[in-house]
Amino acid sequence: FSAIRVSPNYSNDKTVFATTLGDGVYRSVNRGNSWQLFNTGIANKYLKGNLEIAKVGSTDYVLFLAPGHGELYRRSSSETSWTKLLGTTAGVSIVAVSPSFAQNTTVMTASTSGNLQISIDGANNWVDRGNPTEAITYGIAIAPGPAREIFLATSSGVFYSNDLGITFTNRSTNIPDETINNIAVSPN
């Protein structure tokens, strides 16, 4: 598997998702005891990108898949297939969703060149932020809450934004001058 995620309602639905380097997406609805293909709507099944899941409502979720070929897909718990949101020309390499997605519907992507895009309506409309850090982005973390603070792990360190990605400040003080390849924020 190249990525594995559990449903935000796992205690009730026992659902787990996994992506593979050849077969696409699998879903288990019984704690991983058995798996079914979950690919309808995805063209290329070789998935080297990332999969994110966000809670919406008390029992629903939405999945966002950046397969690693430039495009971005979305699928909700009630949909029967994936919907392509952005084509390969977008160059999407990673996707991140707000931990407060049910309240603020914020999604952010980064391309292989470091170009950022943000959506504050559940990925229906996108705003291109360019490459404000002039670096390659390897990870995105959106802080919980209404402020939607954003942290980037980049080839030039850690960057921070408190204005939905319009501006970023380098926050790499006391970190070695090297590439940061992942970043996360506390859920609290």
Where does each model-flagged region fall?
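Extracellular glycan-interacting surfaces
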Residues: 1-188
